[in-house]
């Protein structure tokens, strides 16, 4: 996948209408939801992250964790679809200012070479990259990811926060039937 960017490609207005998502198949809903989660998590732990991008990304993570499964299970769930449309937009507001990370760097060629949907490739790679990045200065942020995903982080150490965040991502991915392996 080649990315081309030009200021003339940036729209003046973006219309995000959850009603247009009602007919999306479950697999597409799951994959695009995990793509949005990957956007939020990658840009939250990227070295360029700062207080404003963190605010957007934590809210997006929370909204996705609370609504993605419902949107996958029932495509006509108005509240879940609306929350997911807002969450993906909020995640985009954050990552457009700080960038993404190695998950997307690897997901693009994975999708191209193995015909893997982009969101599925992201979902497969995200937990492993999170574990790898846990050795970085971003490690203290993982406990906030876990908390945003609904984990009770009271009294957790940094290492426990990392594990909880990774496990929460894996659990959400599995709950919406994202393949857990490439084959």
Enumerate the language-model features and the residues they cover.
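Carboxylate- and glycine-rich phosphate/diphosphate-binding segment that chelates Mg2+/Mn2+
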Residues: 2-98
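Non-catalytic, surface-exposed connector residues within folded enzymatic/regulatory domains
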Residues: 31, 78, 100, 120, ...
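Glycine-rich phosphate/pyrophosphate-binding beta-alpha loops
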Residues: 89-122
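Gly/Pro-rich interdomain helix-loop hinge
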Residues: 113-183
């Amino acid at each position: 996948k080649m990315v081309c960017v030009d200021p003339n490609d940036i729209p003046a207005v973006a219309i995000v209408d959850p009603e247009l998502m009602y007919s999306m198949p479950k697999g597409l809903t799951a994959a695009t939801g995990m793509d949005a989660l990957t956007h939020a998590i990658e840009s939250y732990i990227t070295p360029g992250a700062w207080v404003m991008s963190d605010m957007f990304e934590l809210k997006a993570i929370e909204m996705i964790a609370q609504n993605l499964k419902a949107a996958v299970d029932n495509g006509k769930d108005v509240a879940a679809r609306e929350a997911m449309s807002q969450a993906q937009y909020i995640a985009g507001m954050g990552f457009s200012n700080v960038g993404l990370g190695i998950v997307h760097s690897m997901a693009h060629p994975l999708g191209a070479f193995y015909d893997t949907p982009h969101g599925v490739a992201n979902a497969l790679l995200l937990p492993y990259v999170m574990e790898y990045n846990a050795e970085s200065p971003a490690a203290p942020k993982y406990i906030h990811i876990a908390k945003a995903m609904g984990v009770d982080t009271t009294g957790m150490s940094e290492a426990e926060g990392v594990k909880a965040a990774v496990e929460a991502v894996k659990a959400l991915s599995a709950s919406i039937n994202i393949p857990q392996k490439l084959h």
